[in-house]
Structures are given as structure tokens and as C-alpha cells.
């Protein structure tokens, strides 16, 4: 059950990040070990209640044997940003560790839950490795239809 929830959260995060090239590296994203070459989303933009395919391509400079992610998101409602819960996760619960250095690809298809609110979102994803070093840090802002 926890793994299913974690996968849904990671996939939702990827939907938000890739929608309309609205992601950027965080300010101060110093010496990231993962460089994103391409993020794609079909259809773009994603639609609530429909299936979406998310694909990621990049390059990892060092092997990852373990690590963590911190994902925070805010939703714009009633004229202001409302912070949603922050999620702390183990990278190896989503990916098979160790993750080897070199080219990296990830692709998945999911149905965007019908209960997902339409609207404007913003947030940040920070990934760290087994030594608590920066893997990458991304910010995003998007609209989910």
C-alpha cells in the first residue's frame, strides 16, 4: 500500500514538473550528479481522470546506492497559495538500487486520479544520495487541467 502511494506521488510530481516545460533547476543547485536531458509528457497538458505517459532521460555522474527525496507542493486557491503536505521518500522504493552512473531513462503511464483538483500548482523536488549530496533540485509551476 505504501509503495503504491509513493509511486502515485512520484508520478504526480513528474506530471507537474514536465507539464509545459515549466520546471527549472533550483537556485543554488550546486554540483548536481543528475542532469536532465529530456522530460516528455503525453498528452501535454495532462487531463484529470485520463491516462498520461511520463518519460525522463538524463545522465547520472555517480552511482546511487540509496538516497531520499523531499517534495513540497502548493496549490493556488481563494487568492493565495496553500501549502500541501511535504513528502519525504526513499529513492530506492521507486527505483531499483543501486542506480548505475551513466545514461538514465524512466517511463511510466498512470491515470491522473479524478479527485485531483484542477488549478495552479508550484513546488520543489530535492533529491540527495547515500552521502546526503545533491543529486538534483527542481522547481516547477504549472496548471493541471
From Swiss-Prot:
Keyword Ion transport: no
Alphabetized InterPro entries for the sequence: Ig_E-set, ML_dom, NPC2-like
BP terms from Gene Ontology: sterol transport
Span of the signal peptide: 1-20
A GO term for molecular function: sterol binding
Glycosylation sites: 134
Keywords for this protein: Glycoprotein, Lipid transport, Signal, Transport
Highest taxon above the source species: Eukaryota
One Pfam short name: E1_DerP2_DerF2
SUPFAM superfamilies named in the record: E set domains
Keyword Signal: yes
Self-association state and partner proteins as the record states: Monomer.
Task of the protein: Catalyzes the intermembrane transfer of phosphatidylglycerol and phosphatidylinositol.
Family designation: Belongs to the NPC2 family.
Protein's recorded name: Putative phosphatidylglycerol/phosphatidylinositol transfer protein DDB_G0282179
